[in-house]
């Protein structure tokens, strides 16, 4: 067994609340890492002050949301990754989360797949030089993201094989993949070398991990058994106004 670590997505768990409150609550719950979506729409000075006051690390943040499936957006995507690498260095994180864009209805799917692979190959040298891993994110289209291109994990893992870079992997969102395909444990076990980060939320509803059909303590035990040592980002919207109790309980699931 190896150390699997929790991280709290402050954009969802503490939506509309201050960085200071979010970071203090995370630390008091016994968790030592946070993550968030966009770095470009935040007061990074205030965020880092709250993070450092509470002795937290930043496990991940996002790249700019620019399509990879449209070659016309390639230059903007590369520029966005370059800017996100600079932000990641400032924030001390080595994981960047990338969405891939929506389906182009007028273009064959194979061409969109190829564009995605080509774009990732172009940014791979930037990531390698910076020692930062970019993780592409499959999302469910049935409930939360209608029209999104990358839905199934098998295509995501195929893309990683085709790109063939140690610095480009998949973020496996357990909530999204439960909706899209199920078979969570086998898909994780068989592809753990291609996974760089996890996300988790209860299903249905995308609320606390304690609520729903996914047996998270068991899932986390199975991830530990693969010797994965990265983070599981807790990315959910709480049903309860006070986040502390649920976070503290989940933190206990990571104690070995």
Where in the sequence are the language-model features?
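Histidine-acidic metal/acid-base catalytic patches
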Residues: 1-30, 92-94, 150-172, 176-256
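Active-site-proximal loop/turn and secondary-structure-junction residues that shape catalytic pockets
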Residues: 12-14, 38-40, 64-67, 101-104, ...
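N-terminal substrate-binding region of glycoside hydrolase catalytic domains
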Residues: 23-38, 50, 62-66
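Conserved beta-strand positions in the central sheet of alpha/beta enzyme cores
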Residues: 35, 60-62, 97, 135, ...
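Active-site acidic/histidine proton-transfer and metal-coordination neighborhood
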Residues: 40, 53, 70-169, 179
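Short acidic, glycine/proline-enriched helix-loop-strand junctions
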Residues: 43-61, 132
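Metal-dependent catalytic neighborhoods of phosphoester/phosphodiester hydrolases
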Residues: 44-48, 73-74, 108-111, 242-246
């Amino acid at each position: 067994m190896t150390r699997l670590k929790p991280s709290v997505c402050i954009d969802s768990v503490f939506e509309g609340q201050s960085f200071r409150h979010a970071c203090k609550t995370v630390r008091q719950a016994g968790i030592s890492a946070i993550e968030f979506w966009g770095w470009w729409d935040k007061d990074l000075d205030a965020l880092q002050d709250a993070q450092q006051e509470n002795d937290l690390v930043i496990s991940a943040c996002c790249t700019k949301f620019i399509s990879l499936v449209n070659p016309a957006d390639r230059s903007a995507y590369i520029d966005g990754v370059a800017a996100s690498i600079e932000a990641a260095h400032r924030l001390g994180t080595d994981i960047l989360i990338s969405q891939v864009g929506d389906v182009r209805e007028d273009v064959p799917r194979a061409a969109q797949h190829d564009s995605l692979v080509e774009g990732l190959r172009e940014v791979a040298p930037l990531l390698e030089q910076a020692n930062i891993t970019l993780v592409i994110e499959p999302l469910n289209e049935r409930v939360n993201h209608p029209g999104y291109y990358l839905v199934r994990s098998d295509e995501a893992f195929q893309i990683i094989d085709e790109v063939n870079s140690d610095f480009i992997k998949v973020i496996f969102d357990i909530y999204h993949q439960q909706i899209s395909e199920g078979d969570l444990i086998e898909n994780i076990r068989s592809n753990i070398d291609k996974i760089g980060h996890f996300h988790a939320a209860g299903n249905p509803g995308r609320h606390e991990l304690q609520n729903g059909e996914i047996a998270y303590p068991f899932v986390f035990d199975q991830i530990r058994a693969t010797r994965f040592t990265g983070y599981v980002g807790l990315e959910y919207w709480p049903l309860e106004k006070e986040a502390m109790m649920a976070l503290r309980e989940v933190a206990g699931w990571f104690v070995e």
